[in-house]
A protein has these predicted regions:
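Extended alpha-helical coiled-coil "stalk/arm" regions that scaffold and mediate dimerization/assembly
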Residues: 123, 127-135
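N-terminal leader/propeptide and maturation segments of large enzyme subunits in energy/redox metabolism
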Residues: 153-158, 163-166
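M16 family metallopeptidases and their MPP-like homologs
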Residues: 6-123, 141-151, 157
Length: 166
């Protein structure tokens, strides 16, 4: 229940693996949905399934338990501050840079997220998240479909060419 778009794409047989990512360390954040090893001819169906699934989520609402679980998980990670092999200070500095680059007055905003998590928790039953989907995903005119298609044997050909030169 936590990944309806992913599940819809998998159920439709698009790609061997489907995942999403969000990059917000830039002035214009970017959200992407990736279907690995998908058939190039499924581009239209890929977009259609995503749009239909998002429209259904906006209309019927997101699973509130999944939203709460996601927020709780984010809060747990924030409070634990377990970054594995990476020093906390280094990662805190990198988090500060993500906001500091674009607003000199708020370098610590990413380190002070408990109020934001509480706000998100309070919005679960209000349609807030569905409105975000509508505004930033469905009504966004700045989308693109990018196909990265490998050329079979390209590395082998480059290696042979390099051997000839050497």
């Amino acid at each position: 229940p936590g990944a309806p778009v992913r599940q819809a794409l998998i159920d439709a047989g698009i790609g061997e693996d489907v995942y999403g990512s969000f990059e917000d360390g830039m002035l214009q954040p970017m959200f992407s949905i990736v279907a690995k090893n998908a058939d190039e001819s499924d581009q239209t169906r890929f977009v259609q399934i995503i749009e239909e699934t998002l429209q259904k989520l906006v209309k019927e609402g997101l699973n509130q338990d999944s939203l709460l679980a996601g927020i709780n998980s984010a809060e747990f990670r924030f409070r634990e501050a377990d970054y594995g092999q990476f020093p906390k200070g280094l990662l805190y500095g990198l988090q500060c840079m993500e906001s500091w680059l674009f607003d000199d007055t708020k370098p610590f905003i990413h380190l002070e997220c408990l109020d934001t998590l509480q706000f998100l928790r309070e919005q679960i039953k209000t349609g807030y998240f569905e409105d975000l989907i509508q505004k930033y995903l469905l009504d966004n005119a700045h989308g693109a479909v990018v196909v990265v298609a490998p050329e079979k044997g390209l590395n082998r050909a480059k290696e042979q060419e390099k051997k000839k030169k050497l």
